[in-house]
Amino acid sequence: SNKQRIVLPESLEERTLTAADMALADEIAEIILIGNPDEIFALAEKLGLKNIGKATIIDPATSEKTAEYANLLYELRKNKGMTPEKAAQQVLDPLYFGCLIIKSGDADGQISGALSTTGETLRPALQIIKCSPGITCVSGAMLMITQTPEYGENGVLVVGDVAVTPMPDASQLAQIAVCTAQTAKSVARFADPNVAMLKKKKKF
């Protein structure tokens, strides 16, 4: 199967679980939910969701992979002061656990931020997965779907960076432009993205 394996660490957030159910119903991705299965199924029942049983549910508190992931976290971060004890504790954080699943090759991506701040979402990704080679500036991109097909690609725009680097310099802006175009190609399937750079003159 060429379906992407997507981790959802915020499994008890209602919008997240509903989106997971929709993705499972449409068979557009393999979904990995992080959390306690009983709590996840209880919320699914409350929300009337029918497809959550098709997801892989992993509870860091009981998973046989937890010790392996904790050791990986320790190895990745020991030069930054990580200890085995700290790693054993931090691996229980769903955001860290999800990034470790990806780093181990057991998943392809993670979606979070419904309950977590941008900083909380990015921190484990930067510590564990890190930036692509040659990229030193972290940036975010969002898909904007409009009702106006002449905008972007059939009404879809990819906008970056709106959340991560508040006052980028020229070099950072160049990297953000390149990364946003790559996101437009890989995520939004744009054939040949046109990049426009906008700058506001003063703060509001």
Give the location of each predicted region.
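Anion-binding alpha/beta catalytic cores of soluble intermediary-metabolism enzymes, centered on
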Residues: S1-F204
